[in-house]
């Protein structure tokens, strides 16, 4: 007989083997050799366990592992791997992969995956869930050295290798040495009331590139970058969502995106967007540069805002050189897109402090002044001490509210537009350009080489250009350029006004064109010189086919000194759009006409009707004439001469062609006899020539 303890162990082994047969067959996918090896190992483990186990009775519970259960069963049998479990596996066979265990087993093997072998079943674990790589704990590195913060990396940097961000970082940093910071495509965000990046020192040379700078909120100048006395290069950056916070005792601030003082800043492929400054007198929603320089290549300055000057950017006593850049959809009270020059509370330096700005291959569009009652300069404000050259660029769809839809120039020096389109801008006065000259500088507006001031709309005066001289000299020169298709109440193309001893010059040189401007309320379709001005229109220019509501379809001069070309020498087709007839001269067009014999013989003005073909009253140009006058380039009354015939024309005879002539012209007498006899339809007849009949052509 067996001992009781041994019997119990034997029964436990039988039970364990039975339960193993009922478990999911997926837990036993190993081949017979592997099964034998594992069973032999378990026999050794079972023997060891049998010697040390204090409790001779083995009972299976849900807490036992597969290893414990199998070991007890093998101890009972005291057999090789060809024992009960092996025979059971041979009998049961390999199940189909479609078979899945039903319900919840009470042994640990019930959680074993279908791909596990018996060896793996000894330590069943859930499959590991793939996880994303951990975010580097270090913020930046220099070479192979890691740093927990960007500030630590800056402290360690010697400038020989760049600092490279390893992840998005929230940290305000200060750079006071020459180095390169590569954001690595990540975002550097501010977390305190300061600029995200402060750069200062003794002219350090700093490069920041390849990433985004955002979240700056500075109660001082510069939300994104605050730069002082440094040489800085910004490359492949987005600077967005930053703010310089003015008001509440902070005073005037500037540069929501970038503030630079006494610094030279270069930007290449940088977007400065949706930055702002607050406080009623704060400037430079996107960028503020003072006493320095700014170079831009392939940049976008867009959707920035300032309550005072320079929604996109402002340069005070600084120089801009911008190429292939866009300044779009910015807002401010003065100079919504770009503001050049002093602000009212800064001392005027006079023309000795001139700054020469250059913008090439760029677009300034969709900028709008915030104050419809007082705002000026939708596209840009060009102020005291500033000269500006624009080349191969566009100023489109800007709104200047009161003055200067595209450009307002206050006491600027020279503004030169070379191959520039100024189109579809709007303002109350000077929808294209509003220029005012004071005692500080002479102002010179130059339109060159195909520049077009076209399709701008002013609700007041100066659809294309408004020229206002308070003192000194203001000049507008156009050569091979166009001021056409503009609309205003009066002076739709160019309007001039002066006060005191100021001088205004308008010089339309060869190739200048003024067509299709429309004064919709009163006078001066192309040019309206309200008072004294010097107007010169050269031969090979073209000033015609403009319209005005009350007088002067093309020109209205009230006290100006003017010289006009022979109308037949103007360029273009010289065809009047209203009747398709040839333009051959200048004609009075409403308002008044000078009459030297009027009244007491000293001369005076007589009212005169608008030009029509029937009432045309020609003006013969005189060099430097100075009479008040309203003119239109047109033609006199037109006539058609035809034969006056009596009787039937003889067979084979053709009368001379009709002639269309203007009043005062000579006509050709037909070379025909007084009468001609002949036969028509077999009947003798006589054709009598009675001369020409004049027929008035009415258009």
PLM features: what roles do these ranges have?
Residues 1-3, 26-145, 152-155, 635:
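Low-complexity, acidic Ser/Thr/Pro-rich repeat tracts that form intrinsically disordered stalk/linker regions
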Residues 8-28:
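Sec-dependent N-terminal signal peptides of Gram-positive bacterial secreted proteins and lipoproteins
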Residues 135, 546, 572-621, 667-699:
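Surface-exposed interfaces of beta-sheet-rich extracellular modules
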Residues 153-170, 179-186:
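Glycine-rich repeat segments that build the extracellular carbohydrate-interaction surface of secreted
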Residues 170-180, 188-210, 214-232, 246-263, ...:
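Extracellular beta-strand-rich solenoid/capping regions of secreted or surface-exposed proteins
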Residues 172-174, 190-195, 217-223, 243-250, ...:
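Short glycine/acidic-rich loop motifs that flank beta-strands on beta-rich extracellular proteins
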Residues 183-186, 205-215, 231-245, 264-278, ...:
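Right-handed parallel beta-helix
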């Amino acid at each position: 007989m067996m001992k009781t303890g041994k019997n119990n162990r034997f029964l436990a082994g039988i039970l364990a083997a039975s339960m193993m047969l009922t478990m999911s067959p997926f837990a036993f996918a190993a081949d017979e050799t592997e099964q034998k090896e594992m069973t032999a190992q378990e026999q050794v483990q079972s023997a060891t366990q049998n010697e040390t186990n204090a409790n001779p009775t083995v009972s299976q519970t849900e807490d036992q592992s597969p290893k414990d259960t199998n070991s007890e069963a093998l101890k009972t049998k005291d057999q090789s791997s060809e024992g009960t479990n092996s025979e059971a596996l041979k009998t049961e066979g390999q199940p189909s992969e479609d078979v899945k265990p039903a319900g919840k087993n009470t042994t640990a093997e019930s959680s074993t995956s279908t791909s596990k072998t018996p060896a793996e079943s000894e330590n069943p674990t859930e499959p590991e869930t793939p996880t994303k790589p951990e975010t580097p704990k270090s913020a930046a590195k220099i070479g192979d050295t890691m740093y927990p913060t960007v500030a630590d990396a800056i402290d360690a940097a010697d400038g020989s290798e760049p600092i490279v961000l390893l992840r998005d970082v929230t940290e305000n940093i200060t750079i006071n040495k020459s180095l390169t910071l590569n954001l690595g495509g990540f975002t550097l965000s501010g977390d305190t009331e300061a600029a995200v990046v402060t750069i200062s020192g003794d002219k350090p040379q700093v490069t920041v590139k390849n990433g985004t700078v955002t979240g700056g909120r500075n109660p001082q100048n510069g939300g994104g970058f605050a730069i002082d006395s440094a040489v800085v290069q910004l490359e492949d950056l987005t600077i967005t969502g930053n703010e310089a916070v003015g008001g509440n005792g902070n005073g005037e601030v500037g540069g929501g995106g970038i503030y630079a003082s006494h610094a030279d800043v270069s930007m290449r492929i940088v977007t400065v967007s949706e930055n702002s400054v607050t406080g009623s007198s704060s400037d430079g929603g996107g960028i503020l540069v003072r006493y320095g320089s700014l170079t831009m290549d392939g940049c976008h300055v867009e959707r920035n805002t300032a309550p005072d000057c320079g929604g996109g950017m402002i340069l005070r006593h600084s120089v801009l050189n911008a190429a292939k850049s866009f300044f779009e959809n910015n807002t401010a009270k003065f100079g919504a897109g770009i503001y050049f020059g002093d602000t009212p509370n800064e001392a005027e330096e006079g023309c000795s402090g001139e700054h020469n700005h250059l913008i090439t291959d760029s677009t300034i569009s969709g900028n709008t002044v915030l104050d419809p009652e007082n705002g000026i300069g939708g596209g840009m404000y060009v102020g005291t001490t500033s000269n500006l050259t624009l080349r191969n660029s566009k100023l489109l769809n800007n709104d200047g509210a009161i003055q200067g839809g595209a450009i307002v120039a206050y006491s600027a020096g020279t503004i030169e537009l070379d191959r520039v389109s100024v189109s579809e801008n709007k303002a109350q006065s000077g929808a294209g350009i509003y220029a005012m000259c004071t005692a500080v500088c002479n102002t010179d507006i130059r339109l060159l080489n195909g520049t077009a001031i076209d399709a701008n709309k002013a609700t007041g005066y100066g659809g294309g250009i408004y020229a206002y001289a308070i003192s000194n000299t203001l000049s507008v020169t156009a050569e091979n350029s166009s001021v056409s298709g503009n609309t205003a109440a009066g002076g739709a193309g160019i309007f001039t006004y002066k006060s005191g001893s100021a001088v205004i010059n308008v010089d339309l040189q060869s190739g200048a064109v003024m067509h299709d401007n429309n004064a919709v309320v009163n006078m001066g379709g192309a040019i309206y010189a309200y008072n004294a001005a010097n107007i010169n229109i050269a031969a090979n220019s073209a000033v015609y086919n403009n319209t005005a509501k009350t007088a002067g379809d093309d020109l209205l001069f009230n006290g100006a000194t003017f010289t006009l070309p022979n109308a037949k020498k103007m360029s273009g087709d010289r065809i009047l759009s209203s009747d398709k007839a040839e333009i051959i001269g200048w004609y009075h067009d409403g308002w008044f006409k000078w009459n030297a014999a009027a009244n007491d013989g000293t001369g005076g003005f007589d009212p005169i009707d608008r030009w029509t073909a029937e009432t045309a009253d020609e003006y013969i140009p005189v060099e430097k004439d100075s009479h008040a006058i309203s003119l239109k380039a047109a033609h006199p009354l037109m006539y058609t001469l035809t034969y006056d015939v009596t009787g039937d024309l003889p067979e084979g005879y053709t009368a001379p062609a009709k002639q269309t002539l203007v009043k005062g012209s000579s006509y050709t007498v037909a070379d025909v006899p007084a009468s001609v006899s002949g036969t028509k339809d077999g009947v003798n007849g006589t054709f009598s020539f009675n001369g020409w009949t004049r027929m008035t052509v009415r258009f």
